[in-house]
Amino acid sequence: MDLTSVHSVRDLSSALRIPFIDLVVPCNFCLKFLTNAEKLLFDYFDLHLIWRDNFVFACCQCCARHVSLLEFMLYYQESFEVSEVEELLNQPLVNIGLRCVTCTKKLTVSEKLAVVSAGERVHKVRNKFKAKCSLCRLYII
């Protein structure tokens, strides 16, 4: 059975017929095992498992935040007003794939609308567009 096409922790749990809470998945960066809460957040954030030599890895919350910060510091390109991004890509913001600049979560439609209503800027990092999700917007970071 080829598991390398499995992208979520929940799907891996089902494919292996192991209860979700019993599945151990190491972080790709720090190699600590993800907690059950982190496994749930990994799937909720719509992140994908990493397969290397038939071993699976995910990303813990601490490392996700550190990677986001490093990626922003090293690969930041520029910031745009929402209208500029929509004009550049010729589509409304709700149709554009955005991830959180702080925690890597994929933004929902309501979070994208909150970015628009708050007049926040959208950042281009590594040729991908990023803004803050609703939870990270609560913190002044």
Swiss-Prot record:
Zinc finger (unnamed) in chain: 27-63, 100-136
Keywords: Activator, DNA-binding, Early protein, Host cytoplasm, Host nucleus, Host-virus interaction, Inhibition of host innate immune response by virus, Metal-binding, Modulation of host cell apoptosis by virus, Transcription, Transcription regulation, Viral immunoevasion, Zinc, Zinc-finger
Gene Ontology BP terms: DNA-templated transcription; regulation of DNA-templated transcription; symbiont-mediated perturbation of host apoptosis; symbiont-mediated perturbation of host ubiquitin-like protein modification; symbiont-mediated suppression of host innate immune response; symbiont-mediated suppression of host type I interferon-mediated signaling pathway
Location(s) in or outside the cell: Host cytoplasm; Host nucleus
GO cellular component, one term: host cell cytoplasm
Molecular function terms, GO-annotated: DNA binding; zinc ion binding
Job description of the protein: Plays a major role in the induction and maintenance of cellular transformation. E6 associates with host UBE3A/E6-AP ubiquitin-protein ligase and modulates its activity. Protects host keratinocytes from apoptosis by mediating the degradation of host BAK1. May also inhibit host immune response.
Family per similarity comment: Belongs to the papillomaviridae E6 protein family.
Subunit structure: Forms homodimers. Interacts with ubiquitin-protein ligase UBE3A/E6-AP; this interaction stimulates UBE3A ubiquitin activity. Interacts with host BAK1.
Protein name: Protein E6
Lineage: Viruses, Monodnaviria, Shotokuvirae, Cossaviricota, Papovaviricetes
